[in-house]
Curated annotation (Swiss-Prot):
Family statement drawn from the similarity comment of this UniProt entry: Belongs to the NAD-dependent DNA ligase family. LigA subfamily.
Source taxonomy: Bacteria, Pseudomonadati, Pseudomonadota, Alphaproteobacteria, Rickettsiales
Recorded name of the encoding gene: ligA
Gene Ontology CC entries for this record: cytosol
Record-listed Zn(2+) binding positions: C403, C406, C421, C427
GO MF annotation terms: DNA ligase (NAD+) activity; metal ion binding
Sequence positions that bind NAD(+): D34, A35, Q36, Y37, D38, S84, L85, E118, R141, E176, K283, K307
Role summary: DNA ligase that catalyzes the formation of phosphodiester linkages between 5'-phosphoryl and 3'-hydroxyl groups in double-stranded DNA using NAD as a coenzyme and as the energy source for the reaction. It is essential for DNA replication and repair of damaged DNA.
Gene3D superfamilies documented for this protein: 5' to 3' exonuclease, C-terminal subdomain, 6.20.10.30, BRCT domain, DNA ligase/mRNA capping enzyme, Helix hairpin bin, Nucleic acid-binding proteins
Species of provenance: Anaplasma phagocytophilum (strain HZ)
Protein name according to UniProt: DNA ligase
Annotated CDD domains: BRCT_DNA_ligase_like (cd17748), LIGANc (cd00114)
EC code: 6.5.1.2
Pfam families membership: BRCT (PF00533), DNA_ligase_aden (PF01653), DNA_ligase_OB (PF03120), DNA_ligase_ZBD (PF03119), HHH_2 (PF12826), Nlig-Ia (PF22745)
Amino acid sequence: MSDNDSRRRLADLNAQLKLHDVLYHEHDAPEISDAQYDALVQEKRELLEKFPELSAYNDYEGVIGALTVDARLPKIAHREPMLSLENSFTIQDVEKFISRVKRSLNMDPEVSITIACEPKIDGLSFAALYEKGSLIRVATRGNGHLGEDITNTAKVIRKLPHKIANAPEVLEVRGEIYMHHSDFEKLKDVCNFANPRNAAAGSIRQLNPKIAEERNLRYVAYCIVNSALASQEAILKQLAEWGFCTHTEVLFADNMDDALSFHTRMYNTRSTLGYDIDGIVYKVNDTHLQKLLGSTSKYPRWATAHKFPSTEAITKLRDISVQVGRTGVITPIAELEPINIGGTLVSRASLHNLNEIARKDIRIGDSVIVKRAGEVIPQVVGVDHTARCNSAVPEEYVFPSHCPSCGSTLSRAPGEVAMRCTAELSCQAQVLERVKHFVSRDGLNIVGLGEKQIEFFCNASYISNVADIFSLREKISHMNLSAEHGWGEKSIALLINAINASTTVKLSNFIFALGIRFIGKGAAKLIAEHYRSYSAWVRAMTSLANGEDPDNIHGIGLKSIESLRAFFSSEDNLRVLQTLEEKLNILNEIANTETASPISGKTIVFTGVLEDMSRNEAAKYAETLGAKVGNTVTTKTDILVAGSNSGSKLDTARKLGIQVMNESEWKDLLKTVSNSE
């Protein structure tokens, strides 16, 4: 590459980066994927390393953030700049970071240095200022020097302390605001947000705090500005003691191998978190060393963000189909030229809704950017408009006017972005999806009734609503099911046993299983703990349907209340409930806060093989005694119950000093519970 070519390429890269920084930071409307942006940054970095003389022509250093264009929100000057983090894309980049730190501190390269490893949440940075223990103001990062005042909306974020005991005279806490995947799924039907990050950013900027509260924003705190504490580990511990939410997964690594292993583990398990992370932040743990290292105008020298490998790829959009969800929402699906993303062949991806197709200007024949995050359904996140060819359909995509399953006219409710089929129980596709939801793990957990079996019974008209599941036992005895493809005596017996085992169910699981719109797992538990019994819940919901005022249940918003009212106003739904009431033993719900058991309020993790019960059964029983059951061992885990063939969870628990019980000790503990009742 000649000098002129390299100079032109640098100018082109700077122009592209400047444009995309404005789109991302000022408008929350990126036109390229994170992976594409990172590739531009990496190319510029390599170009400047190869041609150092180009530094004289580098007229764009990027931005820390940018002041979002929203004149409604007052601006706040930060007491200390909110800097960005320098990115590391490869192991070599991380090695350079560690070497640079040691060199700057005049350390022997062979001497270890403790690194705090924290997940990098893909959200919105904030700074919360406290004076004399009281929350005074909360601001966004903005451009790093000037942020937006989001105090009123931030005050409705769950578990963000308004008062702190034993706090210094002035305290500034920083962290990240984000939205859980389950809350985004509920919101995307009614609001035009492309992803959870954009949804969190848009929600926190609402002038009406009630709207932000209903959207259930969450946060993680990870910084105390100008802290006198000796380490990042001590800072996180102090934040937790003050009542702030902190990362559940953190590692303090004494060598780079451990840090990289943590990066790999979090990359492999990120889909189980329920929120987006896009890398791991490495910080020098010793705060005295942090101060010695200092910062550039853009980045702290004592930290770097080790980004995850790209989970995105570009492929051709062959066609657009639509599918019907259990609540009637019509979701457009991208039919793709098959492409390998992260080791999985992807041929279909979600397009979210009609508004997203229009906003991104997606057309059949386009080269589209597809993102796959763990077990989350792949989604189209953008279009490479520069690659649009003559074969791309010139007209905008026309959304169907009728349901592809039942032929009913589609409609869109005021204030919603999703098109919907309102035929409900007369729509076969909705019935199918409702049954799948009903038997899912967090519903009645009928293990022997999988997707193919459900489709078979629905298509054969043996199931027309969820209550029909419990008449299958009788129907199977009158049909020659074993003659059907895929059915044998063993699978039939397993199915009948699974249905029999599911007839006893906790109230919260039952409410969730009904698939009522806006009533997810968390909301179902809040409702169940409020009413305690099935009969009390049904009485209250019947009164609600008859026009009486709703009960005040903390955490249950107006949309959820109206959805419950609509559900109990349907004669079809009431008939199904009546049948289920006759078929099931619905257990009363025990509120965690009022359970007197020795495990009430404790976080318990099960691992290995238990002899007397399955881990799922053990977890359910622990929850009825007021315990919280986790999937991974963290510093917040209280007890690990280890069966035979326990793996890495046992090693982690021992390393963290967490109480470990074998199955016999666990059963002895449960005996003390039963003896006290």
